[in-house]
Amino acid sequence: MPGLLNPDKPAIGRYTRRIDPIRNPYTPGAGSRPPALTGRDDEIEAFRILLARLKLGRPEKSMLITGLRGVGKTVLLNTFEAIAEEQGFRTAKSEITHETDFRPLIARLARRALLAVSPAKRMKERARRAAAVFKAFTLRTPEGLEIGVDVEAMLGRGDSGDLGDDLSDLFLALGEAAAEHETGIVFLLDEVQFLDRAELEALIAALHQVSQRELPLTLAGAGLPQLPALTGTAKSYAERLFRFPTIDRLSEQAARAALELPAEAEGVSYEPQATERILELTEGYPYFLQEYGKHAWTAAAGPTISLDDVERAHDLVQLDLDESFFRVRIGRATKAELAYLAAMASLGDGPYRSGEIAAALGRPGPESVAPTRARLIEKGLIYSPSYGLNEFTVPQFDAFVRRSFPPEAPS
């Protein structure tokens, strides 16, 4: 294949770069779409069915994807966005953070969605009504967003100060406007677990109202594994309103395809032992597959990636993961929280019992470290798969913690 090999390229660091690095197909990065999106067909098909039912005016559960860090939740949301737009839906997407003020955020998304449904100068009756409700809703936000439509705020709709009532008014008005214009609206929210309970209650209540009216408005969201429990705590009927597909590491077949197909498209192949070694090191996690593919490509001295290439790449992959994937997760952790994480990791593979973590810290019982545990869950570093148990939200995080933060001796 022309341009594939570059034999005159000088040695750089530990690698002799002879496969063109510009054509490296692997894309490690937050939310970066992999060149071969494998193992997610069921979730994509479920989303297509959701959209098809909305088009027919039939209620269907919204989707909240759950999974650990690095399994491709954001990639899947981006794929959903593209599918929705291809099918004529209007989309508005954002990411929730610890600092998110939800009311202004949802107002910005609503504005984007409404103007996509109908430009300001061509709004029909329902769209103008939605603009009036939006204007009332934003009276309660500090930003004073404008919609660009000469309408008065619809007092009594969206302006009560109760987020649940106001968001329901806004979503109903948006859904009616979308139906009038023969389209639909898909809100896409990432990191939904960072919403507080009141915000989550309001979002669920608003979607419930929309579903009861069979309006073409839905939510596709993503979050960490604790999300189903959080929604159930916020509203008891959440399980009847949402579908919670859990995505995890890829199957061996899907992982192999995610690794080998992008290289094959560029005329590069893997020795069988090289593929097996990468599958072993990555455990099938999509982000890790992209990292190893990227560095193995760079390490290769020819159009076949060998086991030796993978072993040469291993140290740099580990360094990249430590600095760009693992370490960034703990930037907001306190000394006490780091000690808790180190105690967890010292126990080996999870899940980890709260009592055993307390004992590793030299504390009398789980109650003594419960506040630290709660803060770590709130920050998205650990989650509780069941009562009294704890797990890291990041694959292979235990090994990183053992390398970087050895446990302190119990005092």
Segments and roles (model prediction):
Residues 1-61, 123-126, 410-411:
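A short, basic N-terminal segment
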Residues 59-79, 361:
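Walker A/P-loop nucleotide-binding motif
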Residues 81-100:
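Conserved catalytic segments around the Walker B and adjacent sensor/switch elements
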Residues 86, 101-122, 140-145:
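Conserved NTP-binding/hydrolysis module of P-loop NTPases
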